Amino acid sequence: MPQAPETLDGWYSLHLLYAIDWSSLRLVPTEERQTIVDELQTFLNKHEEARTNHVGDHAFYNITGQKADILLWALRPEMKDLNAFENEFNKLKIADFLIPTYSYVSIIELGNYLAGKSDEDPYENPHIKPRLFPELPQSEYICFYPMDKRRNETYNWYMLPLEKRQELMYAHGKIGRQYAGKIKQFITGSVGFDDFEWGVTLFADDPLQFKKIVYEMRFDETTARYGDFGSFYVGHIVTKDNLQDLFAL
């Protein structure tokens, strides 16, 4: 049986996507609607403490297109912490005007294909630890999509020898490293947690970089032969300064 590579796992991850029920929200008096948005802002402010105390983080983005209107991504030390985060959000007044469109449960993951043998605790490595327990960038744009490694009669990633998978992942990683400084990437593993095997979350100040990296990787053997993808969600950051504009009517 082919050898399964070890993974390094960090914070648990929850992507929540919603459509806004504008028709219902439009019926709410202006003063009451302002109270609803203020409560949402208080919620977001409160959870910035997780970032400050380094026990998690979150990102909030306005999604482009009709698949969703907002994306809320939360990272926490334990899965039950994600439940608490989601439950608290669902009890906000704004939740009465949100329609869930998609969610994704996973965990920050670093593949160990290329790791050498070492007695060092990787969780204490100053280069690895911030990638497992990250402070999320406040980039202008986000791109999220789930994916699988293909497994069928012709191409089955999981039946490849470890050495071949290592070779392919090395070449795959070289492409990603060319976008250092342009894109910040987070891989979350979801085998046993959700319908796909991984989630990919990209941050950039220029959304064109999302197209460039995904297109270039289409020609990489790892993706061309073994990659299957779900829906792509792209959006612009929601900050304290533009939250009011998002819900303005």
UniProtKB/Swiss-Prot annotation:
NCBIfam families: PRK12276.1 (NF008913)
Protein name per Swiss-Prot or TrEMBL: Coproheme decarboxylase
Pfam short name (any one): Chlor_dismutase
Cofactor details (free text): Fe-coproporphyrin III acts both as a substrate and a redox cofactor.
Pathway listed: Porphyrin-containing compound metabolism; protoheme biosynthesis
Family: Belongs to the ChdC family. Type 1 subfamily.
Function according to Swiss-Prot or TrEMBL: Involved in coproporphyrin-dependent heme b biosynthesis. Catalyzes the decarboxylation of Fe-coproporphyrin III (coproheme) to heme b (protoheme IX), the last step of the pathway. The reaction occurs in a stepwise manner with a three-propionate intermediate.
Active site: 145
Cofactor(s) recorded in Swiss-Prot or TrEMBL: Fe-coproporphyrin III
Assigned keywords, A-Z: Heme, Heme biosynthesis, Iron, Metal-binding, Oxidoreductase
One example of a Gene Ontology biological process annotation: heme B biosynthetic process
Residues binding Fe-coproporphyrin III, per UniProt: 131, 145-149, 172, 185
Superkingdom of origin: Bacteria
One term of GO molecular function: oxidoreductase activity, acting on the CH-CH group of donors, oxygen as acceptor
Record-listed E.C. numbers: 1.3.98.5
EC supergroup of this enzyme: oxidoreductase
Cysteine pairs bridged by disulfides in the record: none
Reaction equations catalysed: Fe-coproporphyrin III + 2 H2O2 + 2 H(+) = heme b + 2 CO2 + 4 H2O; Fe-coproporphyrin III + H2O2 + H(+) = harderoheme III + CO2 + 2 H2O; harderoheme III + H2O2 + H(+) = heme b + CO2 + 2 H2O
Source organism of the structure: Staphylococcus saprophyticus subsp. saprophyticus (strain ATCC 15305 / DSM 20229 / NCIMB 8711 / NCTC 7292 / S-41)
